[in-house]
């Protein structure tokens, strides 16, 4: 006799695919996940995953020295991100994340799909709301939304070039209250706030990206292939 064998479905979740249908169909199911989300250990990545990961899973998948920061409060028009009390990733919640290891290939693991969305919102002393919004599928940003580039700078999206305002899935972006003059925000590491540089407008010509050979790539949108590029006279690497 052959014992019954339980077949667990493989659910692919990709940063470049519309995951809406497959996440809805598997909401609440414990499945084998195939995750395609490239991550760099050289800068803060924004993440938002449709599943929970505990400390053991994070250490196994991304390395024990991986760092997580969550949006905690607003102080002096700055969004402050701190290390969470527990090293864990909650489904649908946006984070800043820096893995110990660069992640270039697919990851395979067991997890329960949770198709929720928990945008993190905090108000300043005047009651104005600052939002850190996670997305699990490619999403079109509005002109006033802000994303974090691979150079750890903040950018408004390019609304003039078709498709340039779309960020890939399993990321997060920032929504500031209307009329706010906030130009920076802070990552708080072990009680020390490190400010990330001024917000840039990707519609400006001084944010044009070129290859190292001088070929024009286009305006910076945070979604460049691997390589060495030049922007504003400075070289930077996308891994």
Regions found by a protein language model. Name each.
Residues 79-83, 216-217:
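Short alpha-helix capping/helix-loop boundary micro-motifs
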């Amino acid at each position: 006799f052959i014992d019954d064998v339980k077949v667990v479905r493989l659910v692919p979740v990709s940063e470049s695919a519309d995951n809406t249908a497959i996440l809805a169909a598997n909401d609440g199911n414990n499945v084998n996940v195939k995750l395609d989300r490239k991550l760099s250990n050289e800068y803060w990545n924004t993440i938002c995953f449709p599943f929970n990961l505990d400390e053991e899973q994070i250490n196994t998948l991304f390395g024990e020295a991986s760092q997580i920061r969550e949006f905690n409060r607003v102080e002096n028009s700055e969004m402050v991100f701190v290390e969470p009390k527990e090293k864990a990733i909650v489904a649908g919640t946006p984070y800043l994340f820096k893995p110990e290891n660069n992640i270039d290939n697919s990851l395979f693991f067991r997890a329960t799909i949770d198709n929720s969305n928990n945008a993190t919102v905090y108000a300043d002393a005047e009651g104005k709301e600052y939002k850190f919004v996670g997305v699990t599928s490619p999403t079109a940003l509005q002109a006033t939304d802000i994303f974090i580039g691979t150079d750890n700078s903040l950018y408004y999206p390019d609304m003039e070039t078709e498709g340039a305002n779309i960020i890939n899935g399993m990321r997060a972006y920032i929504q500031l209250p209307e009329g706010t003059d906030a130009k920076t925000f802070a990552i708080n590491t072990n009680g020390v706030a490190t400010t990330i540089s001024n917000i840039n407008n990707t519609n400006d010509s001084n944010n044009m990206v070129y290859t190292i050979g001088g070929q024009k790539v286009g305006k910076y949108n945070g979604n460049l292939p691997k390589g060495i590029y030049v922007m504003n006279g400075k070289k930077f690497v996308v891994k």
